[in-house]
Amino acid sequence: AENEKIKIDFNLEQQKTNDLSKDKQALNEKITGAAVLKAYKITALAYKSKGVEKEKETDKAARTDKIKVCFTVSENKLVSSGYKRFFVRIARPDNVILTRGPAYTFQFLGQTLQFSAMETLNYEGDAADVCTYFEHPVNGAEMVKGKYFVNIFTEDREIGQTTFELK
């Protein structure tokens, strides 16, 4: 009888251990899912350079030679600290990606994508402001009139997007 009780107790404890393991795995999956960065307060503005260190905001495609993209990276204490690279892709209305050349690529979910600008941030878990520029190369794809799409990526995730219009 005592031997039977020990078997029952053992089976109950084994079931508790299995349940705890499942709970732990579910929590780890939730933490992993929550340990992501997000971008907010995203702005994209077109500029015309006016000499050294001077620029003027414009909404005209023909005058644009620089696009400034700014965003705030969310606070998230679950994300590991360290240097994070943020890739900005700017697509013209015809879906041509603005880039400075064929070497401007990054890996995203197993694909090689072109980027327009990249910025590195030493992320420490706190919200942080990031600004980066796409400077239009002399021989690059022309700026055209219409709606441009801006997407921001880091660590195999798209973390934000916005649009802007040039006339």
Report the location of each language-model feature.
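Membrane-proximal structural modules of membrane-associated proteins and complexes
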Residues: E4-K167
